[in-house]
Amino acid sequence: MIARIWSGRSPLYLLLLPLSWLYGLVALLRRQAYRRGWIRVWRAPLPLVVVGNLTAGGNGKTPLVIWLVEQLQRRGYRVGVVSRGYGGRATCYPLVLGPDTRSVECGDEPLLIAQRTGARVAVAPQRSAAVQALLAQEPLDVVITDDGLQHYALARDMELVVIDGERRFGNGWWLPAGPMRERAARLCSVDAVIVNGGLPRTGEIPMALTGHTLVNLRSGERRVAGQFVTPVVAMAGIGHPPRFFHTLTQLGIPLQATHAFADHQAYQAQVLAALTPQAQPLLMTEKDAVKCRAFAQDNWWYLPVSATLPAEAGDRLLARIAALVAAQPRG
């Protein structure tokens, strides 16, 4: 239902417009308060790059964060990542992720970033506390914030916005009548707009998410998509599950059933086991897999995806970050 409302296919958004106007007014006043110095802004002692979006729901921020971290690491930079840690409940904050940290403590996306990149990751509702926790453990050259565009309490040196190229901004209204956290005009003040899928518009950078090999949650065995010839069951607890199901179909994997869960869903073993009564393969996203490894069955698989950007555009982004680091004394 909410997808129909936000996409503009249902007139029910009209009932939510008063709440949207209130949301928009509060968001505008809040941003102005930070810009005018009425509320204190904390600046990190090193360059900070924000990766965020203007809409609610999954747009591909985390794959871009992973791409940035990996590319910067290859160039010899010491990179840290901070996040709100949505979906996790730690006993205390800030929490710096370690080898035994669970997704229920830190959230699924921070754990995925840490596992994929090996970078130091910290979570806290107050992002400045997360940055300080990272710096207390080891020197860094740059910090990347996963989903912090609207966290104006934290000063930033570079803003990257990811948008879904298929859904764009839906009906264009603020939450809850539409998907917008801020109006589309905010794009005029960011450093780069990265479009995940669809057709990029002038000045936007296209990004594709690619993956062809599935990994077994228990054994780590890898299989190319073409090896799945019998119908499988697919599940996804991400911002936009249909994208994952469409990806599997494009890879030629026959789907017997699909199950969409809420983003950051906390899973129970018996619920997922019931999805495959004939012991069919159960396919999921890598983000879901980090929450299911502890109780995974033998025939559960996940599809890792990686972000790809045009070489020239990607090099420009990395060069701008390198320039920020070069202007900062190295610790």
Swiss-Prot record:
It catalyses: a lipid A disaccharide + ATP = a lipid IVA + ADP + H(+). The keyword tRNA processing does not apply. ATP binds at T55, A56, G57, G58, N59, G60, K61, T62. GO terms for cellular component: plasma membrane. Pfam families: LpxK. It is an enzyme of class 2 (transferase). Keywords: ATP-binding, Kinase, Lipid A biosynthesis, Lipid biosynthesis, Lipid metabolism, Nucleotide-binding, Transferase. Pathway: Glycolipid biosynthesis; lipid IV(A) biosynthesis; lipid IV(A) from (3R)-3-hydroxytetradecanoyl-[acyl-carrier-protein] and UDP-N-acetyl-alpha-D-glucosamine: step 6/6. Its EC number is 2.7.1.130. SUPFAM superfamilies: P-loop containing nucleoside triphosphate hydrolases (SSF52540). This is Tetraacyldisaccharide 4'-kinase. It comes from Edwardsiella ictaluri (strain 93-146).
